[in-house]
Amino acid sequence: MDIIFKDLINLWGKPVNKEKIDLNLPIGSISTDTRTIEKGNFFVPLVGKNFDGHNFLNMAFDIGVQGAIVSKEFNGSIPAGLPHWVVSDTLDAYQQIALLHRRNLNLPVIAVTGSVGKTTTRELIRGVLSSLGEIVSSTENENNEIGVPKTLLRGMGSDAAFVLEMGMRGLGQIECLSRISEPDIAVITNVGQAHIGI
């Protein structure tokens, strides 16, 4: 990860417990899941209908994360020594980090969407481009507001390109995913009636 802590200050201001970190060091790999988190990672607790990642802040701290993002709506326990930024929305912050990483890498981004055929088209493009080097591509469930940033954050400077799949579950979602990823090339497989009711 090429993002340093000072970059996060440019996004959200100074963190709580700023003295605990060297602002010129990389923030480490981004993790949203304490089941796979490792020492030196940066923790982003996401919130859903049936879960709240903030409940695992203490576990993440015990594992040895370098820092975290915390929603201003969270009223629970935050480890006393944890460097963290307080933000309005942790998902939005996660997306901002992914966009910053995408811009730093400056790799070509190809986005694929459409009523049908997205996954097949994505895999065909990935296969064609594979002769150029490593292609970072969406997996089956990485085509939404959480998955697209996750794919972008997997990218490295040695990679050749991103091929992203973008699904739509609501009005404005493709616009949101496009803002996160800033695609250089957009592929629309077709436009049918699959999402008329959304």
Language model features with spans:
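N-terminal leader/targeting and accessory segments in enzymes
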Residues: 1-96
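Phosphate-binding loop of NTP-binding sites
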Residues: 12, 93-198
